[in-house]
């Protein structure tokens, strides 16, 4: 079941769709993103989607989250030839639609302005933004409030996941030109694959890169998370989806403003 931030002060805020890595789930990703979520909460509502396919837990998951199953993947692992790419795409999009509809039912009504993913979820995030760029069907365009303007790609690799075969067949370029934020851990064993996503599949003029001294995980130290959030707020401002700090607990939260002014 998708996991959402329960704070009702976020109901009116623009929303970011968050996609976990393979071999984890929405609950785990919410925990992994706890520092990013706190820093972004004055400006965005983060909603965590659950992948459709059962999976074994990822190698770095068991040590901390082994009791947090069931574990899921965005694509069948290992690959299952009995499930066509079209059916894989349908299952993915159905999971995302369920997340969107459930959050709408909770009373949230902010526009869906960005997508954030880690590892396999980052690959899907890039694919969703590419679909948005090329006018594909699926979830983009079906819901009036879905208008992804940028993506945050934490340790992501290519190639794109084909979510709309007809749209993919008609595009003239496989390069993602909508804004992307790439977050690379310099100690990550998959670093070269993450750099390939940036260099081969994304337009360097609209892509920004953050490198940090970490391995294959979401930044959780405040000093590392702040750098990521600063870039998110910068791109959000450029794309017109940054909301001024909200009133919480009788006072004004200036977390985002402070980050931008630093």
Curated annotation (Swiss-Prot):
Pathway: Secondary metabolite biosynthesis. InterPro entries: AB_hydrolase_fold, FSH-like_dom, LovG. Pfam families: FSH1. GO terms for molecular function: hydrolase activity. Keywords: Hydrolase. SUPFAM superfamilies: alpha/beta-Hydrolases. The active site is at 119 (charge relay system), 188 (charge relay system), 216 (charge relay system). It is an enzyme of class 3 (hydrolase). One of its GO terms (biological process) is secondary metabolite biosynthetic process. Its EC number is 3.1.2.-. Induction: Expression is under the control of the azaphilone cluster-specific transcription factor azaR. It comes from the Eukaryota. GO terms for cellular component: cytoplasm; nucleus. Probable esterase; part of the gene cluster that mediates the biosynthesis of azaphilones, a class of fungal metabolites characterized by a highly oxygenated pyrano-quinone bicyclic core and exhibiting a broad range of bioactivities. In the first step, the non-reducing polyketide synthase azaA forms the hexaketide precursor from successive condensations of five malonyl-CoA units, presumably with a simple acetyl-CoA starter unit. Belongs to the LovG family. This is Probable esterase azaC. The gene is azaC.
């Amino acid at each position: 079941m998708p996991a959402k931030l329960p704070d009702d002060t976020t109901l009116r805020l623009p929303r970011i769709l968050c996609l976990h890595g393979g071999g984890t789930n929405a609950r785990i990703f919410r925990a992994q993103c706890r520092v990013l979520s706190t820093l972004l909460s004055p400006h965005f509502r983060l909603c965590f989607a659950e992948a459709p396919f059962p999976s074994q837990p990822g190698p770095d998951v068991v040590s901390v989250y082994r009791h947090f199953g069931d574990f899921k993947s965005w694509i069948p692992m290992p690959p299952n030839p009995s499930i066509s790419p079209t059916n894989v795409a349908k299952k993915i999009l159905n999971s995302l639609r369920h997340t969107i509809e459930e959050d709408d039912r909770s009373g949230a009504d902010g526009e869906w302005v960005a997508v954030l993913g880690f590892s396999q979820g980052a690959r899907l995030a890039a694919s969703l933004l590419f679909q948005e760029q090329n006018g594909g069907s699926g979830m983009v365009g079906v819901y009036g409030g879905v208008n992804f303007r940028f993506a945050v790609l934490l340790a992501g690799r290519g190639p794109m996941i084909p979510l709309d075969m007809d749209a993919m067949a008609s595009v003239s370029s496989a390069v993602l030109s909508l804004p992307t934020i790439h977050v690379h851990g310099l100690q990550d064993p998959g670093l070269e694959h993450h750099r390939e996503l940036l260099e081969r599949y994304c337009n360097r003029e609209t892509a920004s890169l953050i490198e940090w001294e970490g391995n294959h995980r979401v930044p959780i130290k405040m000093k590392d998370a702040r750098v990521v959030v600063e870039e998110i707020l910068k791109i959000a401002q450029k794309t017109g989806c940054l909301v001024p700090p909200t009133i919480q607990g009788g006072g004004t939260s200036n977390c985002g403003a402070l980050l931008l002014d630093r």
